[in-house]
Amino acid sequence: MNNLIDMRQFAKSAGTNIIVKAGNEVFHRGDNGACMYIVQSGTIEMVIGETVIETVGPNEAIGFMSMIDTQPRSSTARVKEDSELSVIDQRTFRFMVDEVPNFALYIMGVLARRIRGMSAVMSE
């Protein structure tokens, strides 16, 4: 993804970093969302049921919609290959929105791409 900023370095220092092995889920559709994740390395599939809506990789955010609207997770994040993720809590997310240049544009870009991806899947 061609982002305005590379969030990995900031997220790695601002968040808690975890390793998730292939085949595991980061979160499940319907879960309450208290954090978001920035993918440092690896690949995550965003799925609804068994339909892959999107595949995300390094420098991409997942789980951020729950930071914006406090609604449950809208999809399941399934790890396709071993991944390192930076966990960003609500407080850090708000700080990033307020203080990190271009972060809001970064999130809007991810949202736009996700909407386009879902539209493409639905039209198939």
Please describe what each predicted stretch is.
Residues 1-124:
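Cytosolic regulatory regions built on CNB/CRP/Popeye-like sensor folds
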